[in-house]
Amino acid sequence: MTALAWGQSPTIKVEGGMIQGVPSATSEVTVFRGIPYAAPPVGDLRWKRPQPVGKWKGIKVADTFSNICWQPGNAVGTFYGNEFYWKEQTVQSEDCLYLNVWAPADAIGNPAGKLPVAFWVHGGAYFNGYGHEITMDGDAWAKRGVILVTINYRLGIFGFLAHPELSAENPDGTSGNYGTYDQVAALKWVHDNIAQFGGDPDNITVLGQSAGAASIKNLVSSPLSKGLIRNAIIQSGGGIGSFGSSDSGQKQAEATGKSFMDKFGYNDLKAMRAVPAERLLEIFKAEGMNLFRPHIDGLLLTESFDDAARNQHLANANYMIGCTLDDIRPMGKQIDEFCFLRDSLDHRPAYQYLFARKLPGTHDGAFHSAELWYMFHTLDRSWRPMTEADYRLADEVMDCWTNFVKYGNPNKPGSESWKPFTLGNPYIKTFNVRYGE
């Protein structure tokens, strides 16, 4: 493949048409921002499963991140608003089913490249977040020979409302879980199209943090993602336990959705789909924040993650799992239990980590989500007074994460310094700066 001048990127064909990426801020990396992976879920497609993306004419230059899905957001003045969302506000829309790809520039248009692929699912309690948050960037991943994909998926009432009338219009008699269906659709899009970016469709690692990690647990449990996942990283999403998921069934989810919509006078599908998105978000923020999340519908999710793990129904993948130091009280035991199951039942032990760095600048410690600055190597975007030791730690974290994506093992080839967590040796890799740094 002939090298192209800086500022140029080859056009490639993906589902829907021709696209062209743009140079990233890092040399020798190309980024594709805002690629549609499904039709906009608007109008009659509100509360329907993702539909195939429409075709476009000409070349779509993927130079702009998309709108984000409707969400309450994290206001400046709150902890997470101050930490991650202080810089800019992003336009919200129901037309939000887009993904972003970072790849080495010389890999674009080379299906024989077979580079490993990381598929990132953001967190946010299933009602916040998007794929181009300030922490999230794929430059450092691509420089290490890994293609990074980040996605948006429907959230809150838009993504997880179940309702008897929605189920009645669906041939299989189920509703809800639209946000998880979006994730599966995006994963299938990546499998079908990533070779055009130089990626290996048979070497995809799914990873996520918090509700994104709970989403990864759903993806590795779902029969609909069978054969699409080689490796999985579960960050601060618990292990064996109910963190971030619901064991409720279809009928219970429908009853919750109907009761909520009836309360506000929306009693039929026509009325429900006519409600302005702003109004739906308003009532969701007022009384629905903890009501809508994935549930067991018998099709996408046929059993809980816990049962899938115990029944050996999880994706046949390598697993890395962990949390931050401040997460460890609620999550540590759950994570240990998952690792023990992997060793005792599957004889394929997982790799466990603990992120213990207490971030500089405040006394907030190693809080939930603290590792994001490090795993994307975006410390220079943070307002915190990051030190040289923090940058070295970010290098270490990134090396381990990208090694796992490449090899299913966080160690460099020939090294076993990070040992798997087994019954006989329950090893946990700790990430921190050295004492005194």
Identify the residue ranges that each predicted region occupies.
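Short glycine-biased active-site loop of nucleotidyltransferases that positions the nucleotide triphosphate
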Residues: W141, S221-S225, H363-F367, P420-F421
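C-terminal domain-tail junction helix/linker
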Residues: K419-E437
